[in-house]
Amino acid sequence: MWVQYERIIKDNGAICLFAQTKFFYELIKSNEKLFRYDLVWDKVLVTGFLNANRQPLRRHEQIAIFYKHQPKYNPQMRKGKPLHGKGNIKVEKIKKNNVYDTFYAIPDLRKGSTEKYPTSILKFQKLHSSQMIYPTEKPIELLEYLIKTYTDEDDTVLDNCMGSGTTGVACKNTNRNFIGIEINQKTFEIAKKRLKI
């Protein structure tokens, strides 16, 4: 797998691979040279109810990020609270009553940009099993997030285990080119239908 990935990946390209538990660590060990960091997908919905008496319920999956050289990185900014203001704090008299005398308050000094850089925790709700077309299907929004983070419009994205074609749908939604590979013919037909090929 790595021989082919390293052959086709651009110098500024990123390889994003999903994995869980033991397989995640084996994946990293398979190419420590190119491994850079991991992201954690918080699925919101939990699984593992049959083992709930023996281990915690699971609600995350890891995403291993590999690359040769610093890839394209377009941080997907998120909304947050404004930063706290600097300088002298001015206390304002806001209310007077008979019981507690006078109340004082510090006015809201927060100002500036509310944009925050992304963290390594990505919160995208997993599809309920009744909505899934394919057993390991990812939310389109999660794949759009990764695609927008590591590529620009008109770039090409490869998914060599494309399943039902969710990555292809995300590429269409974000104006990227898509190459998908699937070994199972029945699943491939589902992907073709979703992608209107």
Language-model features: where?
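Core catalytic lobe of class I
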Residues: M1-I190
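Short, conserved SAM-binding/catalytic segment
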Residues: K192-I197
